[in-house]
A protein has these predicted regions:
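Anion-binding and metal-coordination hotspots
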Residues: 1-202
Length: 202
């Protein structure tokens, strides 16, 4: 007909026909089931302060972000927030610190492929806003993605003949990419708090 037709991308979402409010929960890599997730927040003595039921496909960190503001409005005297490693994300650390509370979270090891350099081996220069690789080459800021991560990339000319290339990237274009959340400094502060001597008993 010669008419222009606008095509829109669709997203396939699995939904329970008997209970549409639940979510698809992943039990490992292969097992899946429709379920709910339940989060309980207690004080230091084990008394329940707050609880939340959410669809099983919601990550614990997303559930926490929703209920945290309600929690501190109801219990203004809260000074410290102690969570497990699954909550050690930049947005949560930012949320706790900007509310005037102190986060206590165990250090979360970076998930890196075996044989590759760890992220901490790339030094971030806050003043120049660049990363410096183990071969002392610069990775410059490229863009910020929708998830709130700043993307840094190397110059392929620096990487082509680098003796550490196989431990750095498998990119066919010889480009190393590192991401840094816009609130990464808050997570770094939380990591610093976690290694203080007075924090260890907690």
């Amino acid at each position: 007909t010669g008419e222009e037709i606008e095509l829109k991308k669709t997203k396939h979402i699995k939904e329970s026909t008997t209970d549409p409010e639940c979510g698809l929960f992943h039990k490992g890599e292969k097992q899946k089931c429709f379920a709910y997730s339940h989060m309980t927040i207690c004080d230091r003595y084990g008394y329940v302060l707050f609880n939340k039921v959410a669809p099983g496909n919601m990550h614990d960190s997303a559930i926490f972000s929703e209920i945290y503001n309600e929690l501190i409005q109801k219990y203004e005297a809260i000074k410290n927030v102690c969570l497990d490693a699954g909550f050690n994300t930049s947005p949560i650390c930012h949320q706790i610190l900007t509310s005037g509370r102190v986060p206590f979270l165990p250090y979360k090891r970076p998930m890196t492929k075996k044989g590759f350099f760890k992220k901490y081996e790339y030094v971030y220069d806050e003043y120049l806003d660049i990363y410096i690789c183990p071969n002392e080459k610069d990775l410059h800021y490229k863009t910020t993605n929708r998830e709130g991560y700043r993307v840094y990339e190397s110059n392929p000319k620096d990487c082509e003949g680098c003796p550490f290339l196989s431990k750095c990237t498998h990119s066919k274009k010889h480009v190393k990419t590192i991401t840094r959340h816009v609130w990464e400094s808050d997570r770094e502060e939380a990591d610093y708090i976690s290694v203080k001597p007075q924090t260890l008993p907690i």
